[in-house]
Amino acid sequence: MRVRGIERNCQNLWKWGIMLLGILMTCSNADNLWVTVYYGVPVWKEATTTLFCASDAKSYKTEAHNIWATHACVPTDPNPQEIELENVTENFNMWRNNMVEQMHEDIISLWDQSLKPCVKLTPLCVTLNCIDEVMENVTMKNNNVTEEIRMKNCSFNITTVVRDKTKQVHALFYRLDIVPIDNDNSTNSTNYRLINCNTSAITQACPKVSFEPIPIHYCAPAGFAILKCRDKRFNGTGPCTNVSTVQCTHGIRPVVSTQLLLNGSLAEEEIIIRSENLTNNAKIIIVQLNESVAINCTRPYRNIRQRTSIGLGQALYTTKTRSIIGQAYCNISKNEWNKTLQQVAIKLGNLLNKTTIIFKPSSGGDPEITTHSFNCGGEFFYCNTSGLFNSTWDISKSEWANSTESDDKPITLQCRIKQIINMWQGVGKAMYAPPIEGQINCSSNITGLLLTRDGGTNNSSNETFRPGGGDMRDNWRSELYKYKVVKIEPLGVAPTRAKRRVVEREKRAIGLGAMFLGFLGAAGSTMGARSLTLTVQARQLLSGIVQQQNNLLRAIEAQQHLLQLTVWGIKQLQARILAVERYLKDQQLLGIWGCSGKLICTTTVPWNSSWSNRSLNDIWQNMTWMEWEREIDNYTGLIYRLIEESQTQQEKNEQELLELDKWASLWNWFNITQWLWYIKIFIMIVGGLIGLRIVFAVLSLVNRVRQGYSPLSFQTLLPAPRGPDRPEGIEEEGGERGRDRSIRLVNGFSALIWDDLRNLCLFSYHRLRDLILIAARIVELLGRRGWEALKYLWNLLQYWSRELKNSASSLLDTIAIAVAEGTDRVIEIVRRACRAVLHIPTRIRQGLERLLL
C-alpha cells in the first residue's frame, strides 16, 4: 500500500511538472523578439550627392549661347510636389551646406566653359598710344551732377594674317581699363597698356554670349531628397519644426553682384538677418528683405562697335565711336529705400542691443567691392553706393539722426562701365566684355543686402555697418539657406515577435522599393501607425526612377550634336548612374537577406536587448522611424551581418533539403538510374564490415596470444560445448563445467563473408526488433500518460467548475440572506419609529394623568 501511495504521488508530481514546463515554455516563447526587416520606411540621413538641374530656359530666350547653358537642363515639373512632414524636427545649417559649394563650382564651370572657345587677348598686350577723347562734361539726368566721361582714343599695332606684317588700328577704351606704362600717372603720359596684362590671362567674351540669368532648379536624384524648412522666421541655423520634402528647389537666378542682392526671394513676414556669428565682425551679414526695392539702370549713350582682326580667325571688338548723351546711372526710390533701411536698422539694433545704427560706404578695396557691381544688358556696371549707405538711425527716438528729405526724389547712383573685368571665380583670370551697341536699360529688384560690421572694442551704443560682398557663395547661400540634401534609407530593422519558421521554395517576385519622395510624408507617424502603407510606397520607386531617367535621357539627347557636354550634361549622367546604383544596392541587400519582393521580412536572428532595451509597445506606439533609426544606428552594421549569416545558413539547410527531393517519390527508389548507386553503397557497406571484422579478429588473436594461447594456424579450432553423454574433461585433469568445445576460427574467404553477412543480418534483426519494441513501449506509455493527463485535466476542470458554481451559489445565498436580514432590520426600525410616533399622544396623556394624580 505504501508503494502504491508513493507511485500515485510521483504520478501527480509528474503531471504537475509537465504542466509547469509547458507554461514556462509558452511564457518564454512569448517574450522572445526577433529581427524583422522593413523595406520602405521613411528614414533619411544627411548626405552629399551630385545634383542636376531643371530649367525652362527655352521659354525665356532662344539664345543658344547663354552663359548659364541651361538648355541642357531637364524641363521643370509643371506640377511640383511638396509633401509636408508632420511631427518632424530637422537641423539646418546654411553655412555648412554642400549645395552652396556645388552651385558655386557649377557656376564657375559654366563661366569657364562658355568663355573657352572665345578669343584670348594675349596679342593685345602691347603698347597703346592714347590721347583723350574729345568729350564734353555732361549733366546726369534727375541729379544735376556734372561728371567728365573719361575715354581714351588709342592706337596700336597688331599682327595681320601675314605674321611678319603689322598694321595700326584705333579703338576707344575706358580710362579704368588701361594704365600708364611704368606706373607713370602724369596727365601728359601717352603710353598705356591693358590693366590686367601683367597679372591675368584675358579672354574676350564671345560676341553672341548672353549674361541674362535664367532660374535654375537644383534637383536630387532618385534615392535622395531635398528637405525644405518652411519656418517663416528661420535664421538659417538650428532646428526647424516646419519641414517639407521636395524634389527640386525653387528657381534660383545666378545673379553675380556685390553689396546688393538682386532678383532673389523675399521673406514672407519680417526682415530676416542671417549671420554665422553676428558678434564676429569678420563674418558677412546677409539681410533678406520682406519687400523689394526697384532699381532701374540706364546707359543712355549709344556705342558703335567695330571688328578688328588680330590674327588668323581671331577678332577684337572695340568701340569705334559713340554719341554722347549722358553717363550711366541707376535710380532708386528714396522713400522705399529709407523705409527698408529703417526696418533693417531696427532689426540690427534689437539683435545687437544697440540704440544707434550707422550706415557708411565701403571702406575701400577693389572696385568690385567698393561699388555695386553687376551686369546690365551685357555691360558690367560699377555703381557708387555712397548715396545709399550714408545715414544714422536712432532706435530710441525711432527717427533718422541726420533727418533726410521726405520727398520722393529718386536716389541716383553714378555708375562706371568696365570692359576688362576681374573674374570672381579666382585670381589670375580676367575677361574682356565687348561693347554693346545701342542704348541699354535694365530693371531689377533689390531683395537683400550684404553687410559687414566695423570691428573694435567699442562698448558704446553705436554700431556701424558697411556694404560688402565679393564671395559669390553668399549670393547662392541667400537662396539655398532653407534646403538640405538627405539620403533615403528605405531599409529598416525592428524587433517583433514573428520568426521565420519555414524555408519557402517557391519563386520569389521581383521587388520594387520605396518612393524616394512620396513616402517621406509618413516620417512623423509612429512605427505602428496605420498610415504607413508600405505597399503603396514600394510601388513608386522604380516608376519614379524610370520617369526621371527618361527626362534625363531626353535632355542628354538634345546635346548630342555638341562635341562636348556642358557641366549640366555631366551631372545628368552622374545622377542617372547614381539612381540605378542606389536601387541595385538596396535590392542586393534584400536578396542577400532572402527578402526579395517582401516589404516585411521576418528573420531567425534574435533581438539583443543591448541594441535597445525598450519594450515592444514603446517602440511601435511612441517612436517614429527616424527616432528609432538614430537609437540603433551604431548597431545597424552588426544586425545586417547577423541577418546575412543567418540567411547563408538557411540557404545551406535549404540546399540539403532540396537534395532529398529525389527520394520524395517511392517510384524513384526503384529507378534503374539509381541501381548502380545502390550497388556502390552496398559494396562500400560490405567492404567496411569485412574490414572491420578482420581488424577485430586480428585484435582478438593478439589478445589471446598475450594471454598465453598460441594457435597453430588459422584453422585452430575454438572450444565448443560438449554433449550431455560426454564426460567433462579427462581423468587426470578433470573437466570444467560449462566449457565450450572448439570450433574453427575461419574456414576460407567465402565462409568468412558468409559468417559476417549472417551475423550482420541477425544483429540488425535483433536490434531493430528491440528498437521497435522500445518505441512501441514508449508510445504506449506516452499515450497512457497523455490520456491520464487529459482525464486529469478534464476532472480538474470539472472540479473547479463545480467549485466555482458552488462558490457562486454560496455567494448569491449569502448576499440574499444579508439583504433579507438587512431589509427585515430596516422594516423593524421603521415600524418601531412609526409606533413610537403613534404612541406620543398616549404617552402625553399618561404623563398628564400622573401629574394630576
Curated annotation (Swiss-Prot):
Keywords, comma-separated and alphabetical: AIDS, Apoptosis, Clathrin-mediated endocytosis of virus by host, Cleavage on pair of basic residues, Coiled coil, Disulfide bond, Fusion of virus membrane with host endosomal membrane, Fusion of virus membrane with host membrane, Glycoprotein, Host cell membrane, Host endosome, Host membrane, Host-virus interaction, Lipoprotein, Membrane, Palmitate, Signal, Transmembrane, Transmembrane helix, Viral attachment to host cell, Viral envelope protein, Viral immunoevasion, Viral penetration into host cytoplasm, Virion, Virus endocytosis by host, Virus entry into host cell
Q: Which residues cross the membrane?
A: 682-702
Spans annotated as V1: 130-153
Which residue ranges are assigned to the Extracellular compartment in the record's topology? 32-681
Tell me which Gene Ontology terms the entry assigns under biological process.
Answer: clathrin-dependent endocytosis of virus by host cell; fusion of virus membrane with host endosome membrane; fusion of virus membrane with host plasma membrane; positive regulation of plasma membrane raft polarization; positive regulation of receptor clustering; viral protein processing; virion attachment to host cell
Q: Which cysteines are joined by disulfide bonds?
A: 53-73, 118-206, 125-197, 130-154, 219-248, 229-240, 297-330, 376-442, 383-415, 595-601
Question: Region (V2) spans which residues?
Answer: 154-197
Instruction: Report the superkingdom from the record.
Output: Viruses
Which intervals of the chain are annotated as region V5?
457-468, 460-468
Q: Does the keyword Metal-binding apply?
A: no
V3 as annotated region, ranges: 297-329
Q: Which residues are glycosylated?
A: 87, 137, 144, 153, 157, 185, 188, 198, 235, 242, 263, 277, 290, 296, 331, 338, 353, 384, 390, 402, 441, 445, 458-459, 462, 608, 613, 622, 634, 671
Position of sequence motif Di-leucine internalization motif: 852-853
What is stated as this protein's family in its record? Belongs to the HIV-1 env protein family.
Domain comment (free text): Some of the most genetically diverse regions of the viral genome are present in Env. They are called variable regions 1 through 5 (V1 through V5). Coreceptor usage of gp120 is determined mainly by the primary structure of the third variable region (V3) in the outer domain of gp120. The sequence of V3 determines which coreceptor, CCR5 and/or CXCR4 (corresponding to R5/macrophage, X4/T cell and R5X4/T cell and macrophage tropism), is used to trigger the fusion potential of the Env complex, and hence which cells the virus can infect. Binding to CCR5 involves a region adjacent in addition to V3.
What name does the UniProt record give this protein? Envelope glycoprotein gp160
